[in-house]
Curated annotation (Swiss-Prot):
Any GO CC annotation of this UniProt entry: cytoplasm
SUPFAM superfamilies hit by this protein: PH domain-like
Limits of the PH domain: 220-316, 418-512
Positions of modified residues (Phosphotyrosine): 557
Organism: Mus musculus (Mouse)
The protein's name: Actin filament-associated protein 1-like 1
Length: 768
């Protein structure tokens, strides 16, 4: 085989081998040898202009001393003499001689350059100049002198901080530390911009330690750099930023083993803000939902585009078997909001104390912090409540095997299983949200760092004499405040509307307040969310009241034996015996003696109070429904007009052109008439619904009942004629949800249906 052809095959094979070695951990000597081979390959086959990221210019005379670049090649011997004996698969033959031989091509190449000079220390006047990179080519990869470098560090360029162990050379006229044998090959560079040198002189340099360096932090990473991260109050701090395994990790120092911030990129939104007169830096802003969780500053637009490219590759969805895009990590959502917004790695605030006490000190300012809590990772989302329940059981088993638990601990665990008076809440601490396990006990709210550590609590609030007020701005619709003497004691946030309603009901009972969840004023929530909060709050409020009345066990429905119902007036007793199915909305009752005669009145029942909040809620709902129906009505009217116009044109065509096509035109006219009739029926149904909604809207705006609690004059007269003596028995009957629903008046739609249909039919008769 021809030697030139062998060289042509050898160069790509060596290039592939070097690319594979870039991903391996190499020692110092092996790394230097690899870089020497890479330099030889570059001299044989130069890289394209776009991939050349550095250039060294040696200004020293050849006779004044050896160049460090030249001295690196002296130890490298390329065995090219035995290339003829190489087999086709690239393995050397057994008879190959281990002695290196010089090829004629190498001899001719060696004759063009001066012979190598002996290794001597460089003269004092020797220096090398490095041409700086182009604009935007900022260093991004960091390597230590122990030889562990991240992937593709040769192409992208990185820098190393020198230490005192290297010999000194004169760089640009000043004594500086050199890199000895790795200076020329490490694609490092020196910046000669005066402003950058002054800025570097003011700021401490980040340097990897020699042996104990955490180089595993940047191993197998997609991209990493020391970037400026925006802190809470606008300051900037330089931190090591790494993208690894679909996550963005921030380390305060290169010596840290654990990241200061961990951010899942597949659930984040990234916005690039270029540098301009308003923004002094190129910024990447990471947000989760409506919360901005991280801001990074980059040195150039090219660097920002490179980071954005890596982020897009990381967060790109996976294509499933059926061609559908599947997200890389599951994000579990409930109907209205997220089921639980837990976070395992959150941004630590400056202080771990809650900053509140019984004297009424405030827990934090009203302004929401800029960095919200991060979302929990995919593993915790998949576990959910089942893993928490399993963890609780395992904790109980382990604690029981180690030592016998106290009666108080057993009572605590049993109360967690039976009574829903505990759960996770976000607490505002020093303008930062922290997640705490909150527990209600003996009119006191306890805060724990975790649900497994119930022996100690971070802080507690005595709830007697306090008030609760929902709302903490539009960004936190599920937040509520605990007030004492009109001063904020704590600001808490629930995970969803049901959880917020449950806590409001429990807190109102523990505070001893007579205010119900329906009477509270809710802001920053829509009608559906408000209904969910009020419903959950009412249920938990009545549930907590029944538990406070010494019920042996909580029940939603309980059966009571037949009991005689007595009226307040002893002269008119009733002998009716009723089997009562009391719901959680009924009055409080004691179960000490189940055969006791209970006195129940319909007037004393806990009927639904149609208050101001409920009226406003119904008014908003009916207003939205009215607008929707009017839009549908206009749409149907437009379609009817178009159909009638088309039918009119077809009839004119039939009159003008009687002939063979008239039959087809008549069939088209019949089809259009059928469509017109169907649209007309839809319009009549919409008219019926619209009239009913308008009447309900008027009643809700006037503050009247919209749920049938009071009837019209016509219905009242009918009820009085049918039941002339219904006053006395109704006052003595017990409350039953089914009977109350049956006694309600018929809906407004049925009372107005005949009249509207009659008018619609009259209108149709007039049209025809």
């Amino acid at each position: 085989m021809d030697r030139s052809r062998v060289l042509e095959q050898l160069i790509p094979e060596l290039t592939g081998l070097l690319s594979l070695l870039d991903h391996e951990y190499l020692s110092d000597s092996t790394l230097e040898k690899k870089m020497a081979v890479a330099s030889l390959l570059q001299s044989l086959q130069p890289l394209p202009a776009k991939e050349v990221s550095f250039l060294y210019v040696n200004t020293a005379d050849l006779h004044s001393g050896p160049s460090f670049v030249e001295s690196l090649f002296e130890e490298f011997d390329c065995d090219l003499g035995d290339l003829r004996d190489m087999s086709d698969d690239g393995e050397p033959s057994k008879g190959a001689s281990p002695e290196p031989t010089k090829s004629p091509s190498l001899r001719s190449a060696a004759a063009d350059v001066p012979p190598p000079l002996p290794n001597k220390p460089p003269p004092e006047d020797y220096y090398e100049e490095a041409l700086p990179l182009g604009p935007g080519k900022s260093p991004e990869y960091i390597s230590s002198h122990n030889g562990c470098s991240p992937a593709q560090s040769i192409v992208d360029g990185y820098y190393e901080d020198a230490d005192n162990s290297y010999p000194t050379t004169r760089m640009n006229g000043e004594l500086k530390n050199s890199y000895n044998d790795s200076d020329a090959m490490s694609s490092s560079y020196e910046s000669y911009d005066e402003e950058e040198e002054e800025e570097k002189g003011r700021q401490p340099k980040h340097q990897w330690p020699s042996e104990e360096a955490s180089m595993h932090l940047v191993r197998d990473c997609r991209i990493c750099a020391f970037l400026l991260r925006k802190k809470r109050f606008g300051q900037w701090a330089k931190q090591l930023t790494v993208i690894k395994e679909e996550q963005l990790l921030c380390y305060k120092s290169s010596k840290d083993r654990q990241p200061h911030l961990r951010l899942a990129l597949d659930v984040c939104t990234v916005i690039y803000v270029p540098k301009d007169s308003r923004h002094k830096r190129h910024e990447l802003r990471f947000s989760q939902g409506a919360t901005e969780v991280l801001v990074l500053a980059l040195q150039s637009r090219e660097q920002a585009e490179e980071w954005l490219k890596v982020i897009r590759e990381v967060s790109r969805p996976i294509v499933g078997a059926e061609g559908l895009e599947v997200p890389r990590s599951p994000v579990i959502l409930c109907k209205a909001d997220q089921d639980k917004r837990l976070s395992q790695e959150k941004q630590n605030s400056d202080s771990d104390s809650l900053g509140m006490n019984d004297s009424g000190s405030t827990l934090g300012r009203r302004e929401a912090c800029e960095h919200g809590k991060g979302k929990k990772n995919s593993l915790a989302e998949l576990k959910g409540s089942m893993s928490r329940a399993a963890g609780r059981k395992i904790t109980r088993i382990i604690s029981f095997s180690k030592k016998k638990a106290l009666s108080e601990d057993l009572q605590t665990f049993s109360s967690e299983d039976e009574v829903p008076c505990c759960g996770y809440l976000n607490v505002l601490v020093n303008q930062g949200w922290k997640e705490r396990w909150c527990r209600l006990r003996c009119n006191t709210l306890y805060f724990h760092k975790d649900r497994t550590d119930l022996h100690t609590h971070v802080n507690s609030i005595a709830l007697r004499g306090c008030e609760v007020a929902p709302g903490f701005g539009p960004r936190h619709p599920f937040a509520f405040r605990i007030l004492r003497n009109r001063q904020e004691v704590a600001i808490l946030e629930a995970s969803c509307s049901e959880d917020m309603g449950r806590w409001l009901g429990l807190l109102l009972v523990e505070m001893g307040s007579k205010v119900t969840p329906e009477a509270l004023h809710y802001d920053y929530v829509d009608v559906e969310t408000l209904t969910s909060i009020v419903s959950a709050g009412r249920n938990s409020f009545l549930y907590a009241q029944s538990c406070q009345d010494q019920w042996p066990e909580p029940r939603i429905y309980d059966e009571v034996p037949y009991e005689k119902v007595q009226d307040e007036e002893p002269q008119r007793p009733t002998g009716a015996q009723v089997k009562r199915h009391a719901s959680s909305c009924s009055e409080k009752s004691h179960r000490a003696d189940p055969q006791v005669k209970v006195k129940r009145h319909a007037s004393s029942a806990n009927q639904y109070k149609y208050g101001k909040n409920r009226a406003e809620e119904d008014a908003r709902r009916y207003l939205v429904e009215k607008e929707r129906l009017e839009k549908e009505k206009e749409t149907i009217r437009t379609e009817l007009t178009a159909l009638r116009q088309e039918k009119k044109e077809l009839k004119e065509a039939i009159r003008n052109n009687p002939g063979a096509k008239s039959k087809a035109l008549e069939e088209a006219v019949a089809t259009l008439e059928a469509q017109c009739r169907a649209k007309e029926e839809q319009r009549i149904d919409l008219e019926l619904k619209l009239v009913a909604v308008k009447e309900r809207l008027q009643q809700s705006l006037a503050g009247g009942p919209a749920l049938g609690l009071s009837v019209s004059n016509k219905n009242k007269s009918q009820d009085t004629t049918n039941k002339p003596q219904s006053n006395a028995p109704e006052q003595s009957l017990p409350v039953n949800c089914v009977s109350e629903l049956r006694k309600r008046s018929p809906s407004i739609v049925t009372s107005n249906q005949g009249r509207v249909l009659q008018k619609a039919k009259e209108w149709e008769m007039k049209k025809t």
